[in-house]
Each structure stands twice: as structure tokens, then as C-alpha cells.
Amino acid sequence: MSTPSRPFRSPRRARWLVPVLLLLVWLVVGGALGPYAGKLGEVATNDQASFLPRSAESTRVVDAQQAFQQDETLPVIVVWTADGDGDAAVTAHQQAATRSVAGLEGDPGIVGPASPALPSDDGRALQAVVQVEPDLGERLPDVLADIGDAAGQVPGTRAQLAGPAASQADLSDAFAGIDGLLLAVALITVLVILLLVYRSVLLPLVIILSAVFALALSCAIVYALADRDVVRVDGQVQGILSILVIGAATDYALLLTARFREELARHPDRFGAVRAALRDSWGAVVASAATVALGLLALLLSDLTNNRALGPVGAIGIVCSVLSTLTFLPAVLVLLGRAAYWPAKPVRTGDPEAGHRLWHRVAALVDRAPRRIWALSLAALLACAAFAPTLSSKGVPLDEIFVNDTPSVAAQQTLAEHFPGGSGNPAVVIAEADRLDPVLRAARDTRGVASAAPVTDSGRPGAGTPLVVDGRVRIDATLEAPADSDAAKSTVVRLRAAVHEVSGADALVGGYTAQQYDTQETAAEDRTLIVPVVLAIILVILILLLRSLLMPVLLVATVALNFLATLGVSALVFTHVFGFSGTDASVPLYGFVFLVALGVDYNIFLMSRVREEALRHGVREGILRGLTATGGVITSAGVVLAATFAALGVIPLAFLLQIAFIVAFGVLLDTLVVRSLLVPALARDIGAVAWWPGRLGHRTPAGRD
């Protein structure tokens, strides 16, 4: 009698196939796409013109200016002062200064002849303008060094370089470490925190690997899209993407691994533990990611190019973080089992408080005096929020853009000391050529305008035949106040009103100051539009997840209050600790999107667990069990996210430092006060009614006991 053939290998062996394949796929993804994290800078641009509002008057002037440039150029302003004694006269060196830069004509990167050196009214400074190619890229520092060397040959003087080209070089230098330094600081910080949290060797490395794979995939996708001009990347977006992916992927991984550890204590089988962990946590992870991704996509409604750029890029990073967390991480957890926590050993126990002693005490405190807890927490948050209106978001002056000393800022300060405040950054007026005279008179009569002259055939403003292009002329108006000051912005408003009144001139006013003013106004309009959209998106997601109306409203209100409290504290710290006069116009909106979306994340983690426990044990017990079970992991996630955003501070730009502080402090405030005390205490005090009209909302009043 023949023996029947054996069927395919036991399902017990076949079930190993899926995690092994997933692991191999991610190893290939990481190996093949990993280099794109470093290559993203190749498709990034830090051109300041691309930060302008699409519909602003100053942006239309930028487009109109192109026709008046015989060559595409970027100006370098050379300023000479007395060497060793800045108060000494340097007019005797005027001819030598002119000769020093005249000799640069024809050198690599130099466009046309330099302007003659002109003295300041006080006779203590000279300035000349050298035009360079606008797309020098990595060659720009060398070209600037050549200009500096030539200008430095004037005896008895000290030469400094100011203007757009010098500022661009310093900006590129600030972003130089964004590929390696920022990522290294973030990963090392996260690894140290994970080692302290888990007291394990393998699991922190697995979580870091999951985050790195997510970053590699997201950078590769963004690189491909940016290379095809589908999305735009700059240094700020690049830095935020790295931090966002590392922080979000780690947070989601912490939630899943914490649930897996709980399930290992209940299931002897690692496959069953992973299935249970995924079943109970995937909804919260996906909902949390959706709030962040959709909140970021709301930035597409912005009229500011850099805001719109961050939206899709950040959303891609969040999606890749979720994909890695829900595929790579479960595969590795199945393969490692309890060994993932080595040298710790998850043990089976029936004690729900095991491993959560601290958070059991916090839950007991909330249970004993919920009204007192939420009242004190609310009072503290309101006290902090009271300072929020003092935060100025009108932009920062040039000398505050960088948090360290930079050559271009020092040169600009020297220029402002001896020449009209707006020297080197004139307001630019474009008007119909046949209305040149009345427009010129209107500009010169405007309070705050030091001088105004049409651009001539030589390509420079001054006496001579005005350059007419397509029936239009360009007028450069030098302002009395520094170009980055509030006084200069007020002058631009008056100048616009004056030239707009000239009949038939069709005049437009742009230039650096006008760009700053338009950006400030557009940022305010963006906040008015985007903030309610983000809140509505989050509210809808919470309603779908929690199947309630009142609880989502409560959660959105608490995270909004947390944002206002964070702004209040930030206003005090920025002014009295960092010495900033204000923030970039986009900082409050970025802070809102990140803090509100990420703040809701932690409340989603908490309240989805509370709902799960409440359906089994009642509302009151559900709150206590949910807070006890999630307190540790959510706090760890908050610390990780705060630390990763704090890593943005290694880039010496005020914008990123301000974002780093707002998000880091706000996340810690949310995890330690809002999510740990305020929300549980409010839910405990309100009781089952907070879950109306869902199933929990119809529980008996005993749920409040």
C-alpha cells in the first residue's frame, strides 16, 4: 500500500514566510534608497524669491524686473571702512577702491564691470556693487572670496561683503550640515532615549532602523517628485522632513511595541501577540497619522510657496512612517519575539498594574479629585496663554535671521551705519514709461524715501537716458530706514499709495522691504484660512475614531489651548532668553499645524485605549485603565518627539530654532499636563455624557462613580 504524498509544509512553517519576505523587502528598500537622504540637497533650492507669495504685488515686480536685466545677476555690495578705526575718513582711497573691483571684470562668475566706489555722506565708508552669476551654486563662496581678496588690497581699509549674494552664501553655509549633522544628532538622541526607556539593546536599534527605512523611502519619493518639479524642496523643508519622519516613525513604533509587550504577557505565541497588538493599535496609529498628514496638506491652501512646499513633502514622510511601522516592525517583532526586549523579559501576569505603578498613582489621583485637577491644569494653561498676544510674528530683522555671527549680517550693519538705511535694498517701482516724471515725483515726495532715480541704459539708477523695456521703466527708491525695519515697511505702504494714485502709470512697488511686508500680510491671511481647516479635519477624524461628538470637541479644544499656552511661553523665552524681537511670519502657522496635529496624536492614543477599556469595564474604570496603560509609552513618545524637534536647533537659523522650541516645549506640555491630567480629569468629571451620542454615552450614571 503506497503512502500518500505529504501535503505542503506545515502552516506553522509557512507563516514565517510573510515576515521574512517583509524584512527582505525593507532591507532592499533601505539599501537601495538610503543614499537619497543625502542626495535630497541636490534638488533643494534656497532661492529667497521662491518664498514669496504667489499673488503679491512684490512678486509681480520680481517677474517684471527680469526684463530690465541685460544679464541674470546677483549683486554683491562691497563696503570699505578704515582699518582699525571705523571713524576715520576713507574718501582718499576712493580711486584705489574703484580700481580694486574694476580688475574683477572677466573673472569666472563675474558679470560685467563693477560700479565705481561711492563715498558715504560722512566720508567714513565707500561702497561699490559687483554683479555675479545667479546660479553659481557651490562656486559662490569661491567667487565671493575672490571679490573679498581684490577689495582687501586697498591699503588702510577693511572690506566687507553685503547684499543678496553674500546673504545667500551664508544661508547655504547654515544649511550645509542638514544632510549629516542634523540627522546624526536626531538619531543619536532618539537612540539614547530608547535605551533608557526600554533598557534593552535590540529593540531600540530595531525602532531606529524602522525610522531610517521610512526616511529613506520618503526622501527617495520626494527626490523623484522634486526632480520632476512636482514638489519643491528647500533647506527648511528638508530639515523638517528628516525630523518629522524620525519623530513620527519612532512614536508609532513605541505605541506598537508597547502593545506587543502587553500581548506577550497574555499570549505564549509570538504570532498571536503580534496579531493582537496590530489589531488593537493600527486604528490609533492610522488615525494619528491621518491627522498629521491631512493637517500638513492643508498648507497647500497657503499663498506662500515655502508653506505649500512643506504640505505634500511632510505628508509623504508621515505615510512612509506608518507604512514602515505597520509592516517592517511587526515582521521583526515576529522574528525576534521576546528576544526583542533582551535583556528584559516580558512575563505573563494577571496584574493590570504591573509595570505601570507610577501611572496607576497618577490615575488614582485623577480619580480622587478630577475637578480640582482639571481646574488647576486649566488655570495654569490659561495663565501661559495670556502672553500669546505678545508674540510678534512680523518677521525678523536681517541681523536676527542667523543665530550666530555671519559676515553678510556684519557687512549689512556697517552699510547701514554710513549709508541710508535702505542702501543696497531699494524699493523697486515699475511703471509705464510715459508716466515716468509724475511717478518719480510721487516717489521722491513720499515721506521716508531718501532718493529715487530711474534705471538707465547702463543698467544702474542715476542720471542719463532711462531704460525702457516693453513701454515700462524701473525706478529704484532708496529708503531712509533700514530695509528690514517696521519704519521701512510703513514707507513702502505710503510709496504704494502715492504711485498708485498716478493716473495711467499702472505702477507696482516691490523690492526686499515690500517682499517682507507682503509675506507678513499673506502669512496672517493664511492663518485665518488654514487654522479652521486643520481644526475641522482633526475634528472629523476624531468623530470617526471615537464615535462621539462631545469628546472630539473637548480634545480639539484642549490641544488648541495647549498651542496658545505654548505661544505664550515662547513669547517670554524668545524675548527675554534668546533676545529675539519676534518670529518669522510663518512660525505661528507651522507651530499650530505641528502642535495641534501631533498633540491630538497623543490624545488619540489615550482616548482610543480609554474607549476600548470603557466598553469592557465601564467609563470610570476605562479612564483609569487607559491612563495607566498608555501613560508611560505616550510620555516616552512625547519626549522622543520633543528631542527630535529640538535637534533642529543645530541649524543656526532663527526660524528653525523657534520652530524647534515651540514644538519641543508644546509636545512636552501636552504629554505631561494636557494628556496626563487635564483630559483624563475632564473625562472623569463629565462621565459617560462626554461620549454622547455613542454607545458609551448611554451608559448608566454609575459610569461616573
Curated annotation (Swiss-Prot):
Keywords: Cell membrane, Membrane, Transmembrane, Transmembrane helix
Compartment(s) of residence: Cell membrane
Cellular component aspect of the GO annotation: plasma membrane
Presence of keyword Cell wall biogenesis/degradation: no
Topology relative to the membrane: Multi-pass membrane protein
Cysteines engaged in disulfide bonds, as pairs: none
Pfam families: MMPL (PF03176)
Family from the record: Belongs to the resistance-nodulation-cell division (RND) (TC 2.A.6) family. MmpL subfamily.
PANTHER family assigned to the protein according to its UniProt record, in alphabetical order: MEMBRANE PROTEIN MJ1562-RELATED (PTHR33406), MEMBRANE PROTEIN YDGH-RELATED (PTHR33406:SF6)
Name of the featured protein: Putative membrane protein SCO0839
Organism: Streptomyces coelicolor (strain ATCC BAA-471 / A3(2) / M145)
Organism ancestry: Bacteria, Bacillati, Actinomycetota, Actinomycetes, Kitasatosporales
